[in-house]
Each structure stands twice: as structure tokens, then as C-alpha cells.
Amino acid sequence: MAAAEQVENWLSSRGFRTFPFHDGRVRYVALPAMPPTSVAANAYFFSIDSDLVYWNFFLDFGPLNLGQLYRFCAKLNAALASPKLRGRTIYFYSGTHPHRRTNAAALLSSWAIIFLNQTPEEAYAPFRGATPGFTPFHDATPIACSYNLTVYDCLCGLYKAKNLKFFDFDTFNVDEYEHYEQVENGDLNWHQEGKWLAFAGPHENSEMTRDGYQTLTVDDYGPYFQQKGVTLVVRLNKKYYDERKFLKYGIRVLDLYYLDGSNPPRAILDQFLREVEGNAGGIAVHCKAGLGRTGTCIGCYLMKHFKFTAAEVIGWFRICRPGTIIGPQQHYMAEMEQVMWREGDLYRQRKANEDKEEARPGDKEVVEGMLGSLETLALGAKATAPEAKRSKRHSAKQAADVESSTAAEEAAEEEGKMTQGDELRAMRARNMHGGGGGGMGIRRK
């Protein structure tokens, strides 16, 4: 009997089902412990359960982040390329806990998408019909989650991001990723390399907050942003720093504050989309923790311009930056999906029409164009007054909303209450340096 068959017989006789990948050269199995040496010697078994650890905020347990996915893929690829393991089946195994199984399935299927160039359907096919099924991922809250984000959702988001070249593991700098995700180094992650960056909000001074979070200043971020081509910072939270300090780095700041933990009012989302659509450089977005409001606004842009589904956005963003998009924001994304798709179609149609009109007109068209312009100016003069009034009313309402939201947040702070952003920052600080033990990156032995 061949060695591979002996291992399979041993596993199946004990009720352990294996899931084949790469024509059976790679298999996944959930095991309570490593098989005995007499069995394991006939194959190659490896696990990442104790090496790649997801440090949760609350009840969330995955998916593992982009740096951890990279390290998993590197480990598996090294085993496949090893001359010592030629001809031997490679078993990737995890513990039997539902969270372990779900994260393992996400890792291996993601590897198949990235390195076998498979579609989400192909990459997830070996796991179809797995019993028990895989537990949906939970958002970064301490209460029951009413939005089911599946392994397959994450795969679809990863697949779309890969095809759009939002990341490239051939050039991915895992050390840089793990460095800048640390609180003291920036607490930042790229959702689209070179274009969209999410980070925790800077403060006027660098200090340790009452919740144990190390704040950073504009000067901590400025040089890195300048190096990476960031030209716009969007601030979605209350003002904690002088935005003029970003100017010396060639970066302007757009203020679009709304209440922590909530969904963007339509006027704010519209202004966000208009501003970023006209920005040529990289865009860094922050709220308090850089997770909820930040992910929601960037996600709407991706739905509008790249036709991501809401689930694809959430899945991809949580791989990039764990904990992104929280609670009601998940359902808001689902509600905005079709809206953003329609607006994206109209945007692209309008741009296409504008491109056609840029062709130089003939003499007749020039004259007609001049006459039309004069008519437009005349009509515009009549319409200026009421239009200005509407704009003024809109600005006044937005200012009143900001003032109301700021007052509510300041009142909560005075009472010693923590907002969603405060709680997330506190848990992140704990994970990086305290009770969690090893951060969201690699825990090395």
C-alpha cells in the first residue's frame, strides 16, 4: 500500500475527512492533535494555529489579515518546492474548533486563488458539502452579529482585489505591512495599494490615552504619506489636530464629520465621493479607530467605481484591516450596494459622453456653442440667487448636523463614556501590547 494511501486510510478510519487541493498534492484536515509519528512520517503535516493568531476585538475571530495570509502562502509554497518533500502529500491541518476550521478554509482557498489562479468557485469547491459547515465571521462587537459574512464572501472580495491589482504578492512587503499595522507605528493599512489607506486618527500631541492607546501626530504620518504619494486626508471624526500641519507635506484635509458608530448622512457621502473622484493622488481616510466610518465611506466608493458587492467589500477590507465595518454599517453597505452600482453606471456614462464632446468642433458647432454659452450665462444669472440660497441652506444644515454630533460626542466624553472608536482603539492597544499577547501580526516562537 502506498504511503499516501496509508495516511488517508488512517485518517478516514477515525472519521477525519480530508479536502484535496492542487490535484491532491495538498490536503486540509481538522484534527484534535498531530497524528502519531508512525503515520505523519509518510506525509508532511503542518499547522499555523499557534503561529498565525487572530487577536480579536470582541467576538470577531477572523479572517486572518493580509500579512498572515502572505506568510501562510509562503510556508505552503516552500513545502511544495522542497526537494525533500517531492512525492509526499502535504497536509495542512488545524484544530477542530469551528473558528479554527473557518480560518483554515479561508487561508487555503485564498492560496488557491492567488497561486493557482482559481476563481472563488473553483477555490472553494473542495469545501462544498463540508459537515459541519463553516461558521460565518463575526464583526468587531461584543453582541450577536446579524450579518453573515462567509468564507466565500471573503474569497470573492480577495479575487476581485487581486484582479484589480489592489495588491500583488510578488511585490508585497510583509515586514512593512506588519510594521505599520502596529499602534505605535501608525495603525494603518492599505485597502488599495497606492490609492486608499485607512488609519487611526492623529492627535495634536503624542500621548497615551486613558484607554491605553498611543496617539500619534500629523508629523508621525506626514513623511510616510508624502513618500507614498498621498495628497488628501479625509477626517470623519471630531477635530483632534490642526489640519494645517498636513500642508507642509503637500496634503490637504477634508473635514466630513459625523457621529461615531453611525452611517454617513447622504449629503456627507455625496461630498466624500465628489472630492475623492477629483483627487489624483493617494487618499488616507480616518475616523477615531479607522475601522467603522472609514471602511464604510471607502467601501461605498469601491461599490460605485468597481462594482464590488457589499459582502466583497467587507470581506476584502477585513483581510486588509481586521475589524473594519461594524454593526449596522454592514447592513447599510448592503442597502447601498444597488444605489452605488446605479450611480457608478451613470458616472461612467457621463464621463464617456464628456470624452466624446472633447473632440474639436467644426465652425458651425463653434458658433452654436458660443450662442449656447451666452444663453446659458443669461439663464444662469437668473438662477444664481435661488441656487445660492439652496447651497447656503444645505451648508447651514450640514454645519448644524456636525455641531450636534460633536456636542453629543463631547457630552459622552465628559461623562467618561467610551464611543465605539474609543472601545476599538482600547482593544487594539490591548491586543498589541497587553492581555492579548501578540498583536494581529505574527506571533513568533
Label for each model-derived stretch:
Residues 360-445:
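Long, low-complexity intrinsically disordered regions
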